[in-house]
């Protein structure tokens, strides 16, 4: 938030919201408290949707590296080509 405040002080044009109204960054910064976000309750739009607890298995089995396991690729050997006999006398 402090970065926004310093950027907005250097700007000549005021910041505007979606409706085009100017935003007073100094007032917004003073109203902001770091504890506000931690005390807000989660609002679920769909009450039928359950909340899943975090599980280490959700990482894809890679030990938390964030990669999905790659499927094993089975390949077949290339067919052997027949040797072509060249006629040396033909030009």
Curated annotation (Swiss-Prot):
It is found in: Virion tegument; Virion membrane; Host cell membrane; Host Golgi apparatus membrane. GO terms for cellular component: host cell Golgi membrane; host cell plasma membrane; membrane; viral tegument; virion membrane. The keyword Phosphoprotein applies. Residues 52-62 have a biased composition (Acidic residues). GO terms for biological process: viral budding from Golgi membrane. This is Cytoplasmic envelopment protein 3. Residues 48-81 are annotated as: Disordered. HAMAP family: HSV_CEP3_gammahv. Myristoylation and palmitoylation (probably on one or more of the nearby cysteines at the N-terminus) enable membrane-binding and Golgi apparatus-specific targeting and are essential for efficient packaging. Phosphorylated. Phosphorylation does not seem to be required for recycling to the host Golgi apparatus. Packaging is selective for underphosphorylated forms. It is a lipid-anchor.
